[in-house]
Amino acid sequence: MASELTNRRHEIEQPEAESYYPKPIKPWFVAIRPIRYMLREQRLVFVLVGIAIATLGFTIFSKSSNHQPIPYDVDPLSGYGMRSESSYLPATIHKKPSIEYMSRIGSAGGKIPLGLKRKVLRVVVTGGAGFVGSHLVDRLMARGDNVIVVDNFFTGRKENVMHHFNNPNFEMIRHDVVEPILLEVDQIYHLACPASPVHYKFNPVKTIKTNVVGTLNMLGLAKRVGARFLLTSTSEVYGDPLQHPQVETYWGNVNPIGVRSCYDEGKRTAETLTMDYHRGANVEVRIARIFNTYGPRMCIDDGRVVSNFVAQALRKEPLTVYGDGKQTRSFQFVSDLVEGLMRLMEGEHVGPFNLGNPGEFTMLELAKVVQETIDPNAKIEFRPNTEDDPHKRKPDITKAKELLGWEPKVALRQGLPLMVKDFRQRVFGDQKQDSSTTSSSTE
């Protein structure tokens, strides 16, 4: 009896466990309250209209991006970074870029939809402290890219790029391209090589090593990191041409054992390596064959004909014309060349492309233009011609016009005064300049 009472007491003291819920259960229709609120306040209409407008705008701007522009254009007589509608080029597809390369650069080469920023590229310029390289660096910096200059300063000058030293997007490395270098980049402009007879004849073995081993190293870098590679070759690959004007399909007439062969054959070999990497390793490559170029920042005593004539006229020395003065050359202003290089890099054609001004001058005519510009009383002095000096040189730029939409804009009489102004400042403003003038060449 007692045990029954005890058990009943325990039953009374321990009530049945009730179901426990941390939060009260809400009916299912509570989940649609936000939708009902949006409908009541008509906010859904505004959201849908906004999405429709954004989609329409993006579609319109995407359709207009079927062009491959150079984001900035140059007013060659006023400066860099000028925006121009003429810089937008129709993209004629020759070979589609690799998926790896396009994934790296994104839409950096085309028009950017409204509200989206252009992707900043990491670009290396070998020989970027030199004459042409420094002008190219100016354009790339104006475009907003991160630029790395690689130069051994054999012919380059720090003064050419000093104005970028405080820019966080600029980096300069003292390095010789005959030695390998590891960098993470999207594009490689390979300009490193002595380009004047005085410099490449000074050390011909070093010149051909720069052309061959240096190009090999830069192509290897492009292969490893998936960068696009642009080789600056030269009109010297045509040698003393038997075809005039020269087209890209002409194979040339080069002396392989002459005093200029270290440069001529070196560039021909560099083109071979570039195409072998393109065909064998699927490297994105571009090849430019550059004709005679002039402008500010040229070396004063580098032995090239324009710089020699200008320096001699400023120093009141006779203008030295070699041979009978009937040899012909074509001269392009440096801003025209830089524009062509950038269009080639951003385009979809491998090349090679002739980049030069088809306006042809004899050496005697050039000397007279320099006389008119600097000193009408300057004398002209004739001397024996140099070895292996080509008799004629004129580019056929039909291919560049059709596929790149490029042609030079600056005439010789327009660009020469800008070069004279720069030379005048350096010749008379720097007392350390050597007053002697090296022997001229029609390079």
Swiss-Prot record:
Q: Topological domains (Cytoplasmic): residue ranges?
A: 2-43
Residues of the active site are Y263 (proton acceptor)
Pathway given for this chain reads: Nucleotide-sugar biosynthesis; UDP-alpha-D-xylose biosynthesis; UDP-alpha-D-xylose from UDP-alpha-D-glucuronate: step 1/1
Q: Which Gene3D superfamilies match?
A: NAD(P)-binding Rossmann-like Domain
* Binding positions for NAD(+) per the UniProt entry: 151-176, 263-267, 304
Q: Where does substrate bind?
A: 260, 292, 305-309, 322-329, 389-393
How is it placed in the membrane, per its record?
Answer: Single-pass type II membrane protein
What does the UniProt entry say about where the protein is found?
A: Golgi apparatus, Golgi stack membrane
Where is it mainly found?
Golgi
- Could you list the residue ranges that cross the membrane? 44-64
The keyword Acetylation is annotated on this UniProt entry: yes
The processes (GO biological process) annotated in the record are: D-xylose metabolic process; UDP-D-xylose biosynthetic process
Cofactor(s) needed by this chain: NAD(+)
Annotated positions of the N-acetylalanine modification:
A2
A GO CC term attached to the entry:
Golgi cisterna membrane
Keyword Membrane attached: yes
Q: Which residues lie on this side of the membrane: Lumenal?
A: 65-443
State a single Gene Ontology molecular function: NAD+ binding
Which reaction equations make up its catalytic activity?
UDP-alpha-D-glucuronate + H(+) = UDP-alpha-D-xylose + CO2
Q: Which UniProt keywords apply?
A: Acetylation, Decarboxylase, Golgi apparatus, Lyase, Membrane, NAD, Signal-anchor, Transmembrane, Transmembrane helix
Q: What is its EC number?
A: 4.1.1.35
Per the record, the similarity remark reads: Belongs to the NAD(P)-dependent epimerase/dehydratase family. UDP-glucuronic acid decarboxylase subfamily.
Q: What does this protein do?
A: Catalyzes the NAD-dependent decarboxylation of UDP-glucuronic acid to UDP-xylose. Necessary for the biosynthesis of the core tetrasaccharide in glycosaminoglycan biosynthesis.
Descriptive protein name: UDP-glucuronic acid decarboxylase 4
The species is: Arabidopsis thaliana (Mouse-ear cress)
What high-level taxonomic lineage is stated for the organism? Eukaryota, Viridiplantae, Streptophyta, Embryophyta, Tracheophyta
